[in-house]
């Protein structure tokens, strides 16, 4: 869902700086650079050539990094820079001048959102991270999540699903299962995530009541305890109960099972609950739906209306093996039950809505297009209100239909549950003529187009940046991480309210009633926004990835360019950023533990007058008041990186005046009021170019 852009080089201080402006983006003169929208799927891989030409001695994470004295200052003469006998390569961007910069002819079809992440087998050799050195103390992770069970009632439905008919037997079976597991060493601990393995689950009808406060019971052998689940409409508590603990070193249960030989183990990953948002689907159990279930739907709120329609649909349209069976049991015999599963899933989608063409009128406007599908502008026939319609891509040839449907429904289940002013509302999911559609709240602009317009003022950028932080905080507070934060996945209303979209790559790092931190794995998202640990760690804390991506987005908003193509030492720009840190290798840098001394963060790699390396390689392009917090956000070591709550404690962040939505938590516009701050106005641009789809058409 991104755009191919036109880039040019500007000579400044004897080094090449890549810039992106609307003038160049819409001209016919194309040049290649490491800049916003810089495509990586082109024929000539610039970063690969750079790694071969200038980084032959830095191909491994164990490679040494240049120190401050070995990196040239900006006052070096041209002759000294071109001296072939110099022992140390000059870490500037002048190397670009020597490499072919010709762009391919099919530039209009290149999409920066489809930045091909390297295959796991192609990633540099990973290394074992010593568990003991990565944490300041052995603080129990439970304390970090003591107040994090603030979840909406509909979120409970996604995880605890069974029929009301079997609720009494469920409680008995659950008590027996817990009793057995209590004396079994190979019970829930064998999974590694402290999630009980039981065929019985809590009754969803008991959870999804109309009150803002709900209770559900968990039975043990001799006693019962009650846990309260509060709606997200109430205040959401932070994951970190201590504001001083602003790094991820305290909360992360570091998993040291990293691979050293990627060639032999790249495709032999152990199954876990950390893969993606779609793993929640494993907890879904479709049991028999009786008349009691149908009646109970009438007492549930609109947030779970679709689930009621789904249950009714299964009862009326599916055969008994599907309506009385379980998806988890069908996995063992997927071939024989495949048709029934697909029929049930399709019936679920069709049951909640009418056909697309009956409810919505296509306005023939493409808002964006990417690897996951396309987004179009539609108008509801009932009231002429405008919405965004996401049309999912067709099933790939080698992709099972069951997996294809499951991933889409899993994304919808989570997205439709999120209720926050800085989250784009997901309304419904539809099925028509073999295609799946999702109806979303329409926002007038996307952040990428606003940045491309070059009309944004600094105060407006700061306002949107703080709203982005608030949106990410909301996700982290309920146990979700986005994992694909970028300009393309941020949309803005005409009143200046930023909203996050696209939760297909999201990861659940904390389940209700669990004290375990669930790490994520895999390389997802767009390379320029990824954090370095994603490439080098087998498993990582997804919250730290989100924080890093937030910093990259702010840098792009200020400079209208990417700092690097991807965060690997093969990239000259990133290697310069990692240099001068007082460590001998990149491995030591990315695994540095957290420290109690805040001065170690503020002065780390900071040296006056040196802008060719270290944090100043990035900071000298940003306003001075942002340097302190940006050093913490773009900390190479995830264990030293600041948390999203720590960002909000920064003095500069606190002083930012941000536009906000006040009123009821419901997305109903009639009950909401937007307060715009008087120190800035929000940019308005031509609607023809307000979205990436329009920019595509212009080029």
UniProtKB/Swiss-Prot annotation:
Induction: By the macrolide rapamycin in a TOR-dependent manner.
SUPFAM superfamilies: Protein kinase-like (PK-like)
Any one GO BP annotation for this protein: response to pheromone
Signal sequence region: none
Effect on the protein of changing residue 390 to R: Abolishes kinase activity
Alphabetized Pfam families for the sequence: Pkinase
Gene Ontology molecular function, alphabetical: ATP binding; protein kinase activity; protein serine kinase activity; protein serine/threonine kinase activity
Family: Belongs to the protein kinase superfamily. Ser/Thr protein kinase family.
Function, in words: Protein kinase that functions as a regulator in the pheromone-induced mating pathway downstream of mitogen-activated protein kinase (MAPK) FUS3. Diminishes transcriptional induction of genes in response to pheromone signaling.
Name by which UniProt lists this protein: Serine/threonine-protein kinase PRR2
Gene this chain is encoded by: PRR2
